[in-house]
Every structure is written in C-alpha cells, then in structure tokens.
Amino acid sequence: MLRFLIAFFSFSLLYAQQQAASQREFPKDYFGSPLDIPLSYAGNFCELRPNHFHGGLDIKTDGKEGLKVYAAAEGFVSCIKVSTYGYGKVMYIDHPNGYTTVYAHLQKFAPEIEKFVKERQYLLEKYDVEIEFKPTDFPVKKGDWVALSGNTGGSAGPHLHYEIRDTQTTNAYNPLLFGYPNEDDIAPLVYNLVAYPIGEESAIDGMQEERNVLLGKDKNTDEYLTSKITAQGRIGLGVYTLDKMTGTRNSYGVYKISLWVNGSEKLSYTFDELIKGEDPYLNTLIDYPLYVKTGARVQHLYREPQNKLSIYTTPQESDGIIQVEDG
C-alpha cells in the first residue's frame, strides 16, 4: 500500500502558445478581426457547456447590439441560417485557404444579403430558413461589412459568436491558434482535486469512494496543497479548474491539462480542435453525477473506455490511471 500519493499537475494558460501540441500549421496573419473594437472574450474555445463543447469564441460587443461585423478574410458567403434557437441568425463564409468562418447571434445581415433572406422567408412563408449560396452570389473581401452583431437565437446577451472551421470536415479550431490577440498572464485557478478508486480492488483511505484532497493554495509559492491519503489498487484523479484572463472578470475553460506522476507524464489533453460528432463524449470527460448534483465540472485526469474524444496528446495506452504499488 502506498502511504502518500503524489501527483504533479500543469495547467496551461488560456493562450495557445507557438509550441502547442497540434501538428497542424495555422496561418497567423490571414484572418482579420470580425469587429473594429479591441477583442475581449466572454467565452473561449471548447469551454465545457451542458452536453457540448463551446465551438468558438464569444466576443464581447460592449453590452450592445448593432456593431458592424466584418469578413475576416476574402471568400464568399456560403450559407445563411435563421432560427429562433441555437445560433439565431448566422453567416458562414468560405475562404480559399480551406477554412470557413462563422458569425452567429447576428441582429441582421448587410442590406443586400438581408433583402435576399427576407424575400426567401416570404417565399417559403416561414421564419426559420437555411440558404446555401454559390461562390458568385455574395463574394466578399477581407474587411467587408457583412452583418450587425446581435442577440438572436439561444444567446444570453449581446455578443458575437465567432468560429473558424475546416471547410471540408466542419471540424472547429481554436481561433487563438490563428494569431488573434490575447493578453493573458493569469494562471488558472484550481477549486477542487478529487481522487477516485478504479475497480473493486481499489480503495482510498480504506474506502471504495472518491475523496476530495485539495486543501488550498500556498500564498508564498502559489502551489496547491493536498491532504495525505493512503491508497491501494488503481487510482484516478479529477480536477475542477477554470482559467482567468487579464482585464476581465470572466471565467474560462483551460486550454491544456497534463498529469505527471513521479516525473512521468501519464495523461495530457489540449483543446486545439473540436471534431464533429464528439460532443456526446463530453460527459465522459467529467464527473457527470457530481455535475448533476452540484453544477461543478470536475474533469477526469484518466480516460474511461467509453471516452472517444480526440483531444488527448498522450498515447491511447496511457490512460492516466495510477497503479499504486506496495511500499
């Protein structure tokens, strides 16, 4: 039986650094800002939401609607959707470099496009519409005014939801990988650390139930302190953590989490890309029963068999479970 379980955690800042785990090269100066105000974020990429990951950035619009939204790069309007839920009024622009930018919760589209959409709504005699366009219908140049920001659909307040997707696969990428400004010198905060016995032969302090082990933060070193436990068998860990950003009071999802045990990396995952169809696996990443009970999303630092997420940067066989040896 191991008397003391020691684990080392590294929580990266929100900003995706140049040495990010992703193997794909992202253009850093291709896409411009979709707004003409300094960018500040209300929500970041792959934040954990109810039953899904957040697919983009929520950009603040100073608490109001009607800010001009601009095409981030040359391309053409490929699709318009209008709905009373979800993204509300949303525009998709395809670009020649293989990416699609998405602009959601819009108040209205630029006049020529707005006129076309209204005519289609009258023709179909319904509000909710989805219209696809040819490259020659509504071509745009970088910086063209294409819409006004709003609060439509499932939005809880005025903002612009902005995404960058792969045009072919529709997988979403972290927009911060494309060079958007993001001043962040505040480390993420850890609110809880949980130890879980995995399997019938495992126990923590003699009990087959999870145990909260976080005691608090050392003010002198900024390190987090944990209680001493005894454990046997296979142990998993989970962490409740949120990130902060310079200049805002918002809380954000962390960009990367790594688990190290005795100098060896046991598990690591990074939110660079959101694969289409993987949202249902979110609830395998978190302690779902605890979330239902308390609303806190404790993220597992071990991989359960039913977890098919592609976010992991460590090999499949490295599942993050710690085998406690006698001694």
Segments from the language model and where they lie:
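Surface-exposed, glycine-biased beta-strand/turn segments
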Residues: 17-90, 94-100, 107-112, 134-136, ...
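Histidine-centered divalent metal-coordination motifs
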Residues: 105, 159-165
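Catalytic-site microenvironment of enzymes
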Residues: 16, 188, 323, 327
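Exoplasmic/lumenal beta-rich domain surfaces
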Residues: 100-135, 216-223, 260-324
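Short, compositionally biased serine/threonine- and acidic-rich segments at solvent-exposed termini, linkers
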Residues: 164-166, 322-325
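Bacterial Sec-dependent N-terminal signal peptides
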Residues: 1-27
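Short loop/turn motifs enriched for small/polar and acidic residues
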Residues: 165-167, 279-280
